[in-house]
Amino acid sequence: MSQPREPKFTNRRTVRIEWGDCDPAGIVYYPRYFAMLDAATQYLFEAAGWKKADLRRQFDIVGFPMVDTRAKFLVPSSFGDDIVIETRVTAIRNSSFDIEHRVYKPSPDGEILAIEATEVRVWAGPHPDDPKRLKARPLPEVVVRRLMGARDD
């Protein structure tokens, strides 16, 4: 197994909490956060230069499915709140990578950390023997470079 590399590339995006994100108690229903975090991972790749459709076409992959996730909910959010999701890759291995999400809420003193979450994702293409299955593939070097913060020259 290859040693994880330490990327530096980060993306931040603001998300408005909508009425449909909330439960009867008026706070965000936790599965909605996971949908927001999944979108944040896709926006990280967009910030690196690829929309998901471009990645699929250019590298002949199905996507980068999540194989593990965890979250620590520190401060709730409610309808109308604007949260900031900060996303970065924290480690890259041969065919998988780790994502860290930090969700912030505005406060009088700046921002407060509301959620800490992690994901493990696999770079996956169609299985050569069964198109209904996926097979992990090595991450292309250009993807690794961009996720580590390098730009193509």
Question: Whereabouts are the PLM-identified features?
Answer:
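Hot-dog-fold acyl-thioester-processing enzymes
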Residues: 2-66, 125-153
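Exposed loop/turn and edge beta-strand positions of beta-sandwich/beta-sheet ligand-binding modules
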Residues: 60, 67, 83, 97
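HotDog/MaoC-like acyl-thioester-processing domains
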Residues: 2-5, 73, 77-82, 90-153
